[in-house]
């Protein structure tokens, strides 16, 4: 519905702005960003055009969401923060998005005090994987490391809360293991497969998600035109290859047999 209502807004903006104004329009559903050469262009040209366009459709600009900011101060869009650092444009996860995932993890761990470690992992892993996948195209490694540490703290507290006295030491031996000499204290638990064999499942680490820079689609490319068939087939193949590589990495690192975990005795 939002696509239908806002259809034509970009054309209307460019119709009334000069090429030298350097006006660009980016939209997803009912969220959009307009950039320009100066703040005056946005105030005196763009905002009046947008306001009039929306008014004709019985809508109005949200005063809460509408603001003019310099690119060096940055802005948030769809959970991303876009900002210029020392002359270089970088896109990172927004602070609000980071706070949101931390809250979700904290609440999930709190709900899971009565669960087994394997059950907690099965609920947390899709949350962790989904968030990390969403931000794998941007500058996210430092954020991934910060959140991995946050998840460790919450699962450590879960273990301490679940067990008391001397049993805490045994719980630490059970729930925190090592993948290698360089990757220790990974929250994990065992499950039994259909053959009754123990298989250890580990909490996913965001740092294991490979950063894959987005390759922009050619602006002139149209998937409905036959001359671009090969181009979109290549993009589709590249996407599948990236997904397969990530799947293999997940399988290797997050579902591990006993002998691959240091210090585990079957």
Whereabouts are the PLM-identified features?
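Non-catalytic terminal/accessory segments
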Residues: 1-266
């Amino acid at each position: 519905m939002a696509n239908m209502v806002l259809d034509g807004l970009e054309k209307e903006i460019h119709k009334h702005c000069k090429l030298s104004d350097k006006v660009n329009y980016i939209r997803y559903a009912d969220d959009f960003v307009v950039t320009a050469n100066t703040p005056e262009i946005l105030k005196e040209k763009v905002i009046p055009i947008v306001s009039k366009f929306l008014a004709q459709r019985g809508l109005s600009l949200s005063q809460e969401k509408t603001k003019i900011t310099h690119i060096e101060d940055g802005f948030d869009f769809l959970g991303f923060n876009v900002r210029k650092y020392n002359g270089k444009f970088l896109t990172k996860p927004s602070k609000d998005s980071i706070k949101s995932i931390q809250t979700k993890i904290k609440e999930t761990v709190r709900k899971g005090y009565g669960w087994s470690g394997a059950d907690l992992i099965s609920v947390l892993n899709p949350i962790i994987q989904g968030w990390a996948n969403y931000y794998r195209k941007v500058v996210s490694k430092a954020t991934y490391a910060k959140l991995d540490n946050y998840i460790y703290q919450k699962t450590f507290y879960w273990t301490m809360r679940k067990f008391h006295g001397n049993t805490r030491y045994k719980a630490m031996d059970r729930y925190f293991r090592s993948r290698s000499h360089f990757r220790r204290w990974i929250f994990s638990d065992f499950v039994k497969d259909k053959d009754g064999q123990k298989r250890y499942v580990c909490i996913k680490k965001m740092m294991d998600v490979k950063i894959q820079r987005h390759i922009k689609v050619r602006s002139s490319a149209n998937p409905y035109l036959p001359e671009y068939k090969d181009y979109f087939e290549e993009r589709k193949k590249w996407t599948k290859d990236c997904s397969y590589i990530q799947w293999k990495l997940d399988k290797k690192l997050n579902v591990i047999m006993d002998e691959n975990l240091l210090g585990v005795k079957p």
